[in-house]
């Protein structure tokens, strides 16, 4: 069912809307983590490192799918808040066709350029390259379904339905883990089995998402004849979505630069970085949930011309985000020995991973304050500012990491401490802009 976020107590609405998103993200991270544990336990640390060596690249393609979907979702949430159904349907139909076309293009690019991206751009160690290529090419072939699922989820959230995506991800997550066990543990297919399991689970979530959307929402029910791309509408979606896709991609490109630095330190570093990154993604669950919620909350309220309610919602959203994140960070610090044992790391990788897990638990609360404001920027239509902040954080983090890793004080720990330094500066710049209040005059719909 649709949900009107323009009426009621903001923090209660934010929590109610965000919890299904958080649960869905948790499921996604759990099956990613299960994927890693299964590969590491049944195929060894080299296979684990091979999957981890292309992780930042898979995140980049996911970022493009999420970014353009958010752009379409923001526009549609503002039309929904303004009760303009005809324009809403036009934008939704065009967004579906556009995203599926982009997904096909990304699949083609990923499969054809895999060797260049992994060997040249990321500097993947020669010993890992065959396995990494195999995994990534299979993953890239399924990108069209990832793009399809993300636009279906964005359209549903724009109408205030965040629960449906939880059910889609539940099915996808369970299927992924079961297929991992069948293909990797049962059939001994190694990294290829893990990649196939991921693609099949994405196909399932995409198909279920569109079927649910068609059945439950007349606003989002289209015949094949109605699914046409209006060029003017597509241009508007790209205009709004491009800054958000660029923002998501900039963050991911930062990880590409860092991945190259990680690969420089060899297999133990790659394995430990893979594990710590999986855990870091779990810490980000409440943060991303509140960020996505703030985008929809701000979009609907700006469509209803209620900017003061957006400000109130942001303050309350930050408190919710920070409280949940601190609990998870303390739990990670307490559980470091258990995490190390679960992934079967050797002594060298375990030593590195301990430091990384602790530092990420210290740094992530900074994100809990920044990302809700980032979601608000997306929702009110300030895509340029959100992109600028991401570019600022990327530039600072890469500079800090590459400069400080050469010093005796930091060494390889600069790879993760650079994160806290760069995002602290970005947070300050973001909130200076927020308190100036110029965003209150923005609107994406006329």
What are the residue ranges of the model-derived segments?
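Short alpha-helical transmembrane segments in multi-pass integral membrane proteins
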Residues: 1-18, 76-142, 186-242, 298-363, ...
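Residue-level signal for short hydrophobic patches within transmembrane helices
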Residues: 11-30, 34, 57-64, 141, ...
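Transmembrane helical elements of multi-pass membrane transporters/channels
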Residues: 16-35, 138, 172, 201-205, ...
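Helix-terminus/linker motif at the lipid-water interface of multi-pass membrane proteins
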Residues: 26, 30-48, 118-126, 182-189, ...
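Small-residue hotspots at the loop-to-helix junctions and early N-terminal turns
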Residues: 43-56, 132, 136, 195, ...
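Small-residue-rich hydrophobic transmembrane alpha-helices
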Residues: 48-108, 146-165, 272-336, 367-389
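Hydrophobic transmembrane alpha-helices of multi-pass small-molecule transporters
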Residues: 60, 176-181, 206-210, 282-285, ...
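Short runs within selected transmembrane alpha-helices of multi-pass transporters and secretion channels
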Residues: 69, 138-157, 165-173, 194-207, ...
